[in-house]
Amino acid sequence: MSYSGERDNLAPHMALVPMVIEQTSRGERSFDIYSRLLKERVIFLTGQVEDHMANLIVAQMLFLEAENPEKDIYLYINSPGGVITAGISIYDTMQFIKPDVSTICMGQAASMGAFLLTAGAKGKRFCLPNSRVMIHQPLGGYQGQATDIEIHAREILKVKGRMNELMAHHTGQSLEQIERDTERDRFLSAPEAVEYGLVDSILTHRN
C-alpha cells in the first residue's frame, strides 16, 4: 500500500478482451467477458489499486446493489496492492452496501489487495489453493519543505494505525500482533492465510 499524493499511471491495459455472444428473443447480443460476468454478480479487482480502477469497482458494486440488494457480490482479487485512498474507497463501499461481498484471492492479494480480501463478509472470504497473501505497513514518500514532510509523516502514521485497527477487527488478531506482523513484508500461503484469519477457507473446486 502506498500513501502518496502523487498518482502513477497505473491503469491496467487490456489489449484483448474476449467477447461472448448470447441468443436473446431479439437475436444475438455480444458482451465483453467482464460485462457478462457482471450479470452473474462477479467483479474483478486485478492489477494495481488506483483511482480509476477503484471508481469502476465502486460503481459496479452500487449497480449490483440496486439490481438486487439481497444477493451476494463476488469480488475476485489478484493484486499487488496500490494507493491507500483508492483502496479505502472500495473498502468503505463494501461495508456500506447491503449485499454481502464475498472475496476470492486468485494468484496473489498483497498489501491493499490483502486488506480488501480480508474485508469481505465473514464466512465468505476465500483463497484458491496456490494463491498467496502478503501484508505489510503502508509505504510513503514525500518531497518538499521540512515542515510539510513532518505533516505527511504524522499523517502516514495515523493511516498506519487505522489500517492496523481495521485489519485486527477483520482477522480477530490483536492490534499488537498486527503491528508486529506488518512491520515488514509477511507472505502467507493459502493455509496460513486461513489460520491467520485473513480468509475463512480454501476453495479447491466448485460444489
UniProtKB/Swiss-Prot annotation:
It catalyses: Hydrolysis of proteins to small peptides in the presence of ATP and magnesium. alpha-casein is the usual test substrate. In the absence of ATP, only oligopeptides shorter than five residues are hydrolyzed (such as succinyl-Leu-Tyr-|-NHMec, and Leu-Tyr-Leu-|-Tyr-Trp, in which cleavage of the -Tyr-|-Leu- and -Tyr-|-Trp bonds also occurs). Keywords: Cytoplasm, Hydrolase, Protease, Serine protease, Zymogen. The keyword Hydrolase applies. GO terms for molecular function: ATP-dependent peptidase activity; ATPase binding; serine-type endopeptidase activity. The active site is at residues 111, 136. Belongs to the peptidase S14 family. It is found in: Cytoplasm. It comes from Salmonella paratyphi A (strain ATCC 9150 / SARB42). This is ATP-dependent Clp protease proteolytic subunit. SUPFAM superfamilies: ClpP/crotonase. Its EC number is 3.4.21.92. PANTHER family: ATP-DEPENDENT CLP PROTEASE PROTEOLYTIC SUBUNIT. One of its GO terms (biological process) is protein quality control for misfolded or incompletely synthesized proteins. The gene is clpP. It is an enzyme of class 3 (hydrolase). GO terms for cellular component: cytoplasm; endopeptidase Clp complex. Cleaves peptides in various proteins in a process that requires ATP hydrolysis. Has a chymotrypsin-like activity. Plays a major role in the degradation of misfolded proteins. Residues 1-14 form a propeptide. Fourteen ClpP subunits assemble into 2 heptameric rings which stack back to back to give a disk-like structure with a central cavity, resembling the structure of eukaryotic proteasomes. Component of the ClpAP and ClpXP complexes. It comes from the Bacteria. Pfam families: CLP_protease (PF00574). The keyword Protease applies.
